[in-house]
């Protein structure tokens, strides 16, 4: 009888611990999604403010340029389209999100100076700090998904895309600034999508449609 009670206690403790971990993991996922949503909204606001400051002809010219241009993230292997994203594993989406955020650590230092924006006034390093916090959170989620297994991934050994990519391309400051803002918005949208699907992947019964 005593042994049965001890066994029951162990099982109950194990269940409580697992429930606690699941709750913490969900909280981390929710925080990560909220953080990248804010960055995506900030990116949209910054590029809108930038476009509003342009002359009509400048706006037309830049709108033709960007669809034909490349972003730094194009060198990072990632799902293309909704179907491939939905078929990707949670861990794969987390790893890609991590690399995308990491690739902006250096370029983000010039983002705040690209456009005068009330959202970044008083704290020019706000975007870089938010990216660092999000990167840390995603890294914790990756480690939690591995559950003690070594973090082995082919992309981990690859160098990040060129740090000065946005500074060396373009014919003038106007184009470089537009490219920087447009690519930042594009990549934050990617990460938001990947984290939403990854969060959905935690529940096998969920319909993770985009």
Swiss-Prot record:
GO biological process, alphabetically ordered: animal organ development; growth hormone receptor signaling pathway; positive regulation of growth; positive regulation of receptor signaling pathway via JAK-STAT; response to nutrient levels
Residues involved in Zn(2+) binding: 38, 192
One Pfam family cited in the UniProt record for this chain: Hormone_1
Keywords: Disulfide bond, Hormone, Metal-binding, Secreted, Signal, Zinc
SS bond partners: 71-183, 200-208
Major subcellular location class: secreted
One GO cellular component, as annotated: extracellular space
Localisation: Secreted
Signal peptide: 1-22
Domain of life, per lineage: Eukaryota
Record has DNA repair as a keyword: no
InterPro entries, A to Z: 4_helix_cytokine-like_core, Somatotropin, Somatotropin/Prolactin, Somatotropin_CS
UniProt-recorded Gene Ontology molecular function terms: growth hormone activity; growth hormone receptor binding; metal ion binding
Function field: Growth hormone plays an important role in growth control and is involved in the regulation of several anabolic processes. Implicated as an osmoregulatory substance important for seawater adaptation.
Similarity comment: family membership: Belongs to the somatotropin/prolactin family.
PANTHER family associated with the record: SOMATOTROPIN, SOMATOTROPIN,PROLACTIN
Protein name per the record: Somatotropin-2
Organism per entry: Carassius auratus (Goldfish)
């Amino acid at each position: 009888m005593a042994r049965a009670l001890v066994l029951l206690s162990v099982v109950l403790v194990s269940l409580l611990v697992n429930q606690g971990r699941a709750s913490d993991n969900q909280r981390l996922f929710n925080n990560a999604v909220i953080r990248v949503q804010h960055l995506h909204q900030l990116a949209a606001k910054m590029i809108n403010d930038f476009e509003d400051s342009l002359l009509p002809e400048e706006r037309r010219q830049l709108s033709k340029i960007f669809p034909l241009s490349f972003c730094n993230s194009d060198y990072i292997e990632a799902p293309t389209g909704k179907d491939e994203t939905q078929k990707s594993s949670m861990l794969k989406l987390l790893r890609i999100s991590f690399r995308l955020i990491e690739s902006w650590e250096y370029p983000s230092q010039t983002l705040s100076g690209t456009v005068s924006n009330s959202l970044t006034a008083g704290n020019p390093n706000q975007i870089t700090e938010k990216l660092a916090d999000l990167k840390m959170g995603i890294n914790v989620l990756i480690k939690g998904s591995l559950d003690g297994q070594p973090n082995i991934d082919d992309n981990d050994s690859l160098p990040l895309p060129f740090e000065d990519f946005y500074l060396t391309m373009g014919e003038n400051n106007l184009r470089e600034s537009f490219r920087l803002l447009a690519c930042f918005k594009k990549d934050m949208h990617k990460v938001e999508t990947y984290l939403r699907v990854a969060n959905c992947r935690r529940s096998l019964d969920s319909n993770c449609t985009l």
